[in-house]
Regions:
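Extracellular/periplasmic solute-recognition and catalytic clefts
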Residues: 143, 147, 221-232, 257-321, ...
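Ligand-site clamp/hinge motif
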Residues: 206-209, 237-289, 423, 427-440
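Gly/Pro-rich hinge or "lid" segments in bacterial periplasmic/extracellular proteins
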Residues: 82, 89-94, 186-248, 253, ...
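N-terminal lobe/hinge region of extracytoplasmic solute-binding protein
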Residues: 26-40, 51-107, 138, 213
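Alpha-helical secondary-structure segments
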Residues: 53, 129-136, 168-172, 178, ...
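Aromatic- and charge-enriched surface segment that lines or borders ligand/interaction sites
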Residues: 101-146, 170-172, 258, 265-268, ...
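Detector for C-terminal structural segments
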Residues: 35-37, 56, 77, 224-229, ...
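Surface-exposed binding/hinge segments that line
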Residues: 115, 150-198, 217-224
Length: 602
């Protein structure tokens, strides 16, 4: 063991910092809230035990949740088991407790005080303390994590985290915000200081496959690289008896198998090797989810309407490309794509056209914006005026020797039919679209490196419209940021900064609507589809509450986060397997739940 000498001056400084961090005094006029009366959304009939097996399309490139290659879909499984201070009730959007048991608001409008649950524990048994939240700030500001968005947010948006003893903290943001937004924008997740100890230049590589201590109900227990990842429920989880956690997180194990093809995955489901299967895709719902397994009641179907912000799904145009940097080309391309035809044919009328990047955010969404309609006459006129009059023998336009030929990268094989239709109609306007199907991992890396021309994908949603990460020039022309169109517009930058700084709700709404219009006008994003429901099928041994989901449920089969309300009935599982062998039949089940269905289209 090595010992390092510390001179007296440094020792005095360290002691001073330590004493100062514990010497902060809470304001005397704080009014503490807890929302302990929030209504649970689980069922008292739920039982513990069993396993839930699902699939993922690709093995994650890392277990890190920040830094290079961390923004994959698998990150959501890890984040869902890392609790924050508070959360939003999935039905009412009220603030509800997580690691914090109580909270209070400072008079400055930008500070929230939190009392931490003294019983909160990391998965390795260590207590969660105020120091873990202070360490989060140091961690997220470190250049060694190689995460520009987090560096910026935790440096410029969160100005301080103060400690008032081991179990009380305050967080102060850059500007005042409405109370519910303070929790969303300035809320912190603790980082295990005892585990990391220090962050250095080797951090990204060192922690690529480390299983980090967490605070949620499950922890990764087994990894078979390239094959599967298993999460196991903690038998002594510190928050298990919280009222909002009772009767939730019921299965003992969650197994995620890597199956790189959705059709093959569906065959695994029919064999009983997967417990559920999402059937949002019309091809699966109409063509595959039928037959004896459904007629005999072994597999049960459902459609569940939700009411929440819609994924920003569509085509993202990279303005760093020599062709797509021309705004007229981008507008013409939007007019050359017949999304309505795709909806009526391939999608069987099951989907709706998404109208704008931010949809479903109430008054924060600009409802006056409509996606550009299919109009070949308009597309041809725009391209002619933009200098693309000449056409080659194949009908593709040419300007200064360059063909109007663009590559579309996408990561789902089952989307090929819809893009083929768009490709055919675009050619009528003289635009060649080359379809480039990639596996999920390659698709993600291509986009994050900004190596695409056109990318098809959908972003997850948030509490309020997010502009800075997607459209501010600070995130353009560099890899590993979410501005995948490389939009670089100083006027838009100015309004984004004003939106982030504004404290008045009405003014923020106006700014959000104005920004939505500017983004539409820039034509860097072509909206595709929205789906106002989730639907799927599961083996009859999966049981649910009377309300099988919440207002904001994007799937009924989420074992983590605000999900975890289903359970496995072991007796029914044994009965069902026996029934299949002797051809015993049950009543077929195909239910629709529409209590949260929107009354009007957004």
């Amino acid at each position: 063991m090595k010992f390092r000498k510390i001179n007296c001056a440094v020792m005095f400084l360290l002691l001073s910092i330590s004493i100062q961090s514990n010497a902060n005094t809470l304001p005397a006029d704080l009014s503490w809230e807890n929302n302990n009366n929030a209504k649970p959304w689980a069922s008292p009939l739920a039982t513990k035990g069993g396993k839930f097996t699902d699939f993922i399309l690709t093995f994650p490139p890392t277990l890190r949740t920040v830094g290079p290659d961390s923004n994959s879909s698998f990150r959501s499984y890890i984040n869902a088991n890392q609790l924050g201070l508070t959360d939003f009730h999935p039905n009412t959007l009220e603030i509800i407790p997580q690691i914090a048991t109580e909270w209070a608001y400072g008079q400055d409008g930008k500070t929230v005080f939190y009392k931490l649950d003294p019983s909160a524990r990391w998965s390795d048994g260590n207590p969660v303390t105020a120091d873990d939240f202070l360490f989060t700030l140091d961690f997220m500001r470190s250049k060694h994590i190689n995460a520009p968005w987090y560096n910026n947010h935790y440096t410029n948006e969160i100005t301080s985290v103060k400690k008032f003893g081991d179990h009380t903290i305050s967080i102060t943001g850059r500007v005042a915000k409405p109370k519910e937004e303070l929790h969303y924008y300035y809320g912190l997740v603790p980082t295990p200081k005892h585990f990391y100890k220090k962050i250095d230049k080797n951090w990204v590589k060192k922690y690529n496959w480390k299983i980090i201590p967490n605070t949620g109900p499950y922890q990764i227990s087994k990894i078979k690289k390239g094959k599967r990842i298993t999460f196991e429920r903690k038998s002594d989880w510190w928050a298990a008896d919280r009222p909002l956690n009772k009767n939730r997180f019921n299965v003992d194990k969650v197994i995620l198998k890597v199956i790189r093809d959705t059709n093959i995955a569906y065959k695994h489901f029919e064999k009983g090797e997967l417990d559920s299967y999402a059937l949002v895709l019309p091809e699966f719902w109409h063509n595959k989810a039928k037959g004896k397994l459904y007629d005999n009641g072994y597999l049960e179907k459902f459609t569940f309407y939700n009411n929440s912000p819609r994924s920003s799904s569509g085509w993202f145009l990279n303005t760093d490309n020599s062709i797509l940097k021309e705004k007229p080309v981008r507008i013409a391309l939007a007019h050359a794509l017949n999304f309505d035809k795709v909806i009526k044919t391939v999608l069987r009328g099951d989907y709706e056209r998404l109208q704008a990047f931010h949809t479903g955010y109430g008054e924060f969404s600009n409802k006056n914006i409509s996606a550009r309609k299919f109009d070949l006459k308009a597309a041809n006129k725009i391209l002619d005026e933009a200098g693309w009059q000449q056409r080659g023998g194949d009908g593709v336009r040419i300007s200064n020797g360059q063909r109007l030929s663009l590559n579309l990268v996408y990561g789902r094989k089952e989307h090929s039919d819809r893009w083929s239709i768009l490709k055919q109609d675009a050619l009528k306007a003289g635009i060649e679209i080359n379809l480039r199907l990639q596996d999920s991992s390659s698709h993600y890396k291509t986009i994050m490196q900004k190596q695409h021309q056109i990318a098809s994908l959908g972003w997850s949603t948030g509490f309020r419209p997010a502009f800075w990460q997607h459209f501010h020039s600070e995130n353009a022309h560099k890899p590993q940021t979410n501005n995948i169109t490389n939009l670089d517009n100083k006027n838009i930058d100015k309004d984004i900064e004003a939106y982030r700084a504004e404290t008045d709700s009405n003014k923020r709404v106006k700014l959000a609507n104005a920004l939505a219009q500017q983004i539409h006008d820039s034509a860097v994003f072509i909206p595709s589809f929205k789906v106002p429901y989730t639907r799927g099928a599961h083996w009859r041994w999966l049981k649910f509450p009377d309300a099988p989901g919440t207002k904001t449920s994007s799937t009924l089969y989420s074992p983590f986060g605000d999900g975890g309300i289903f359970w496995v009935d072991s007796k029914t599982k044994i009965e069902t397997k026996a029934a299949r062998k002797n051809s015993t039949k049950y009543s077929s089940v195909n239910k629709t739940f529409d209590q949260y269905r929107e009354n009007t289209s957004d």
